[in-house]
């Protein structure tokens, strides 16, 4: 003799199969879409949301722990030490100031004495020939 199954899945499947065999057309598809207890899928949606929530929480935890381990692992990297030291900014600033001073040495201002002495005088312009 076969011991009884405590989950009772087989009788549910057999009754569902018998019901769908008797029905035809669109009523069979609507029965297949309906939940087994007729609760319109409220518990199924809750289950899916719980699974997605656990998955998201687990994934977020892994991501944050990985990011933290990468920060701790690379904190003594020479590149990061160089960036944090701000030596490069001071060198850049000194180089930029030297370039500005070098370019200013070549700068000079031409002064038009006629325009300074007689600012009301009209200066003639050349008209382009056609």
UniProtKB/Swiss-Prot annotation:
Name of protein: Potassium voltage-gated channel subfamily E member 1
Lineage, highest ranks first: Eukaryota, Metazoa, Chordata, Craniata, Vertebrata
Principal localisation: membrane
Subcellular location: Cell membrane; Apical cell membrane; Membrane raft
Gene Ontology BP, a term: ventricular cardiac muscle cell action potential
General function of this protein: Ancillary protein that functions as a regulatory subunit of the voltage-gated potassium (Kv) channel complex composed of pore-forming and potassium-conducting alpha subunits and of regulatory beta subunits. KCNE1 beta subunit modulates the gating kinetics and enhances stability of the channel complex. Alters the gating of the delayed rectifier Kv channel containing KCNB1 alpha subunit. Associates with KCNQ1/KVLQT1 alpha subunit to form the slowly activating delayed rectifier cardiac potassium (IKs) channel responsible for ventricular muscle action potential repolarization.
Sites carrying sugar chains: 5
One Pfam entry name: ISK_Channel
Family: Belongs to the potassium channel KCNE family.
GO terms under cellular component: apical plasma membrane; membrane raft; plasma membrane; voltage-gated potassium channel complex
Molecular function terms from GO: delayed rectifier potassium channel activity; potassium channel regulator activity; transmembrane transporter binding
Subunit structure: Interacts with KCNB1. Interacts with KCNC2. Associates with KCNH2/HERG. Interacts with KCNQ1; targets the complex KCNQ1-KCNE1 to the membrane raft.
Modified residues (Phosphoserine): 103
Membrane topology (UniProt): Single-pass type I membrane protein
Reported modifications of this chain: Phosphorylation inhibits the potassium current.
Transmembrane segments annotated in the record for this chain: 45-67
Keywords: Cell membrane, Glycoprotein, Ion channel, Ion transport, Membrane, Phosphoprotein, Potassium, Potassium channel, Potassium transport, Transmembrane, Transmembrane helix, Transport, Voltage-gated channel
Topology feature Cytoplasmic, residues: 68-130
InterPro entries for this protein: K_chnl_KCNE, KCNE1
């Amino acid at each position: 003799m076969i011991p009884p199954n405590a989950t009772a899945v087989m009788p549910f499947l057999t009754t569902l199969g018998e019901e769908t065999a008797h029905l035809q057309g669109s009523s069979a598809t609507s029965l297949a879409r309906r939940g087994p207890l007729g609760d319109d899928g409220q518990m199924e949606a809750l289950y899916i949301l719980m699974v997605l929530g656990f998955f998201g929480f687990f994934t977020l935890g892994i991501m944050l722990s990985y990011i933290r381990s990468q920060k701790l692992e690379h904190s003594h990297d020479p590149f990061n030490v160089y960036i944090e030291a701000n030596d490069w900014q001071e060198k850049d600033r000194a180089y930029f100031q030297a370039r500005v001073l070098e370019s200013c040495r070549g700068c000079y201002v031409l002064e038009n004495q006629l325009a300074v002495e007689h600012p009301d005088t009209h200066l003639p312009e050349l008209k382009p020939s056609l």
